[in-house]
Amino acid sequence: ILNSPDRACNLAKQAFDEAISELDSLGEESYKDSTLIMQLLXDNLTLWTSDTNEDGGDEIK
């Protein structure tokens, strides 16, 4: 993944999307922890996709 930013972004997006579908089944404490992690993941994904776009890559959708 280190040398494959597109793969890393796709994996992060997949993990984020799958986590969203599981939020309803979590207890309050797990929900808080999960949403924090998901926010960090999304922030990183935004950063990574903007870096990729600046380098001439395609944005992950």
From Swiss-Prot:
Entry superkingdom: Eukaryota
PROSITE patterns attached to this UniProt entry: 1433_2 (PS00797)
InterPro entries: 14-3-3, 14-3-3_dom_sf, 14-3-3_domain
UniProt xrefs under PANTHER family: 14-3-3 PROTEIN (PTHR18860)
Family note: Belongs to the 14-3-3 family.
Annotated protein name in UniProt: 14-3-3-like protein
